[in-house]
């Protein structure tokens, strides 16, 4: 499809057609973070996320004002960046955040972007789809140095072909995911998306996760529990009912539930309040 770039830029609050430079990449990542929430309502309601075409992603995240998970966020952003003149490679990763060292090897079910900026050396890791701990700035795809984002410091380490992204959270380095720099075709990403949106053991199928990152805070909703992380302090809010959770989804996170009107969203949310 011919990307409706203007529609996307309006969705994230930017005007005009920006130049494909590093400043634009930073601005788009920041605007996307604060404008399009992370959410898994489709898998939770039994709706597979199978189509990662530009048409499908634009229709859901822009036209219908929904959110999505990594394959959708980074899928849409990849198409946008290519339309602007950036060179984009899609990569796959394994989520290791909060996993025990001796846990089984996780599947490659995370999607990130490797982006080249015209006229600049090297490549940048871009990820607007890792929920409440997602990168809030592009960082150099370079192992070793600590790299400051709009929020926490991050760093990449490398072991053979594997890169590991870690974030400094409350003073400690937390590994988030590993990935290789081998580009992945869309069909491979659609297989991963199908798996995490339909497998009965997937946490996207069994629990509710919603997140958004503003300029000064990270908002993370898991079931009935909302955590707001801001300037080293965390506020915890516990909702009493599924109705209150849905109100937060609509009014705090800005998700339009109109395209789910034929489904009993409140009943399904009530089933997973404490998961």
UniProtKB/Swiss-Prot annotation:
Keyword Isomerase: no
Statement: the UniProt record of this protein carries the keyword Acyltransferase: yes
Enzyme Commission code(s) on record: 2.3.1.5
GO molecular function annotations of the record: arylamine N-acetyltransferase activity
SUPFAM superfamilies in alphabetical order: Cysteine proteinases
Annotated effect of mutating residue 127 to A/N/W: Loss of activity
Active site (UniProt): 70, 110, 127
InterPro entries (UniProt xref): Arylamine_N-AcTrfase, Papain-like_cys_pep_sf
Catalytically driven reaction(s): an arylamine + acetyl-CoA = an N-acetylarylamine + CoA
Broad EC category: transferase
A family per Pfam: Acetyltransf_2
Keywords per UniProt: Acyltransferase, Transferase
Gene3D superfamilies: Arylamine N-acetyltransferase, Cysteine proteinases
Its biological purpose: Catalyzes the transfer of the acetyl group from acetyl coenzyme A to the free amino group of arylamines and hydrazines. Substrates include isoniazid, anisidine, and 4-aminoveratrole, and to a much lesser extent, p-aminobenzoic acid.
Family recorded in the similarity comment: Belongs to the arylamine N-acetyltransferase family.
Subunit description: Homodimer and homotetramer.
Protein name, as recorded: Arylamine N-acetyltransferase
Source organism of the structure: Mycolicibacterium smegmatis
Lineage: Bacteria, Bacillati, Actinomycetota, Actinomycetes, Mycobacteriales
């Amino acid at each position: 499809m011919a990307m409706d770039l203007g529609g996307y830029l309006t969705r994230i609050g930017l005007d005009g057609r920006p130049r494909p430079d590093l400043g634009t990449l930073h601005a788009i990542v920041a605007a996307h973070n604060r404008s399009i929430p992370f959410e898994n309502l489709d898998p939770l309601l039994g709706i597979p996320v199978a189509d990662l075409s530009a048409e499908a992603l634009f229709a859901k995240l822009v036209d219908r004002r929904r959110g999505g998970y990594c394959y959708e966020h980074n899928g849409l952003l990849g198409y946008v960046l290519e339309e602007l003149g950036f060179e984009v490679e899609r990569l796959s990763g394994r989520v290791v955040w909060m996993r025990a060292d001796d846990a089984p090897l996780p599947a490659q079910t995370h999607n990130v972007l490797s982006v080249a900026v015209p006229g600049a050396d090297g490549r940048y890791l871009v990820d607007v789809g890792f929920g409440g701990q997602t990168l809030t700035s592009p960082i150099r795809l370079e192992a070793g140095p600590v790299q400051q984002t709009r929020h926490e410091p991050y760093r990449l380490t490398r072991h053979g072909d594997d890169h590991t992204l870690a974030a400094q959270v409350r003073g400690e380095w937390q590994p988030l995911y590993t990935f290789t720099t081998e580009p992945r075709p869309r069909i491979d990403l659609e297989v991963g998306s199908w798996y995490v949106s339909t497998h009965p053991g997937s946490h996207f199928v069994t629990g509710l996760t919603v997140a958004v990152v503003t300029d000064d805070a990270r908002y993370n909703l898991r079931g009935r529990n909302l955590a707001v992380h801001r300037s080293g302090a965390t506020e915890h809010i516990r909702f009493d009912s599924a109705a209150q959770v849905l109100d937060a989804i609509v009014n705090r996170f800005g998700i339009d539930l109109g395209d789910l009107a034929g489904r009993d969203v409140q009943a399904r949310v009530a089933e997973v309040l404490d998961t």
